[in-house]
Amino acid sequence: MGRLTQLAALVYVAVAVFACRERAQAVQSEAELKDMVHRMMPMVAQTTGLKFKREPLVLRRSRSQVRDYLIHKIDQDLPSTELAGLQSALRLFGLIPETLDLRPTLIDVLTEQVAGYYDPDSNALYIPEDVEPLQLRVVVSHELVHALQDQYVHLDSIIEQRHANDRRTAAQAILEGQAVVAQIPVLMPEQKPDTFPLGWFWQQRAAMAAQQSQMKQFASAPLWLREGLIFPYLGGADFVVWFRHKYLGRSVLDSMPQSTEQILHPERYASHDAPTELTFAAGEADTVEWEDNLGEYETRLLFQQLLGNEAEATTLATGWDGDRYQVLGAKKDVLVWYSVWDDAAAATRFAGGLQRAWAKRRAGVQTGRRAEVHQMVIDGRPVVRLVDAPADWKGWRALPTVRLSGGT
């Protein structure tokens, strides 16, 4: 999902619209838009505790220009070979249908959802011409926070981490979460997000999803894509509120969470519970076509997709401490996934759930494939390995192995 959430900053944050839309003032001309940005900057600076070092540009774009920008960013971030690898991984996990073509799906969904974006390369806010005037204050206030963030942390360096899906997703959650929390008092000065009960933003997920489900492309997208677009905003906002309570006066940008586990369980961040790193040993079993990790949040989504029960998915993914997978073979038809767990009980619970999920995934399908879920201990740590590959895959004779490092 980190690949996806690199683009999540482009997606219109609908949360604030519920409360703010009626009091927004219509803005029509580009001059009025620039004036809005200038007037909002002090408020954004105050609510974030950061000062603007420079004023961002603000420019209008047609919907076709927005689509062209999205295509450019997707192709830049995911060149064709990497896109093919990611698409194969998502298909092998069952997170997207075998027939789904990822690139046009991403382009269509994001084009439909975008209502403004900040581009670090040009230090500019871009507002589509077809955005309703009453939505502009919501869009501008959110993207202004991203412009300010870019003056303190290098946004591109955060979102361009390679093969570090979970860490990117966690970082994106901070960027989007801070923008959501910061824009609320800008739009509604009487509202104080720091007084919201912990978990309040995540509780708005159903309402946000319902609103977005009225959009054709979003409604027909896979669960992985729909939930992946929402998580950085709502999960990130809840973490930011927690952080502001816990670390009064500190900037959340100074010490980013390292995993979605830390976003989902802020106490893990406070206790410096860093994820365990898994590294595949060099071998000759097959050609590595793609490698990355899921993280706790996408592991939840995997179980939610395969078992259809969100509460059970949350339980099965809890206790995650690190994971790594490879897609192997010229046909990109082999999946090897290792995960390490906090304790043996969590590993056993996960392994049992994964066996049930995979049996359900492959039930009644004659695929000529073989799948194994195996528990083991590496360096004293409980580990679970999933292998799903053609039955005649040569790598079955000598499966890839991993080394563990770090973690707490």
Where are each of the predicted segments found?
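Post-HExxH zinc-binding segment in Zn-dependent metallohydrolases
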Residues: 40, 150-156, 160-208
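Active-site recognition of the HExxH zinc-binding catalytic motif
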Residues: 44, 138-155, 179-180, 240
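Acidic helix-start/capping segments at beta-turn-to-alpha-helix junctions
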Residues: 53-74, 162-166, 197-206, 257-261
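Bacterial signal peptide processing site
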Residues: 21-23
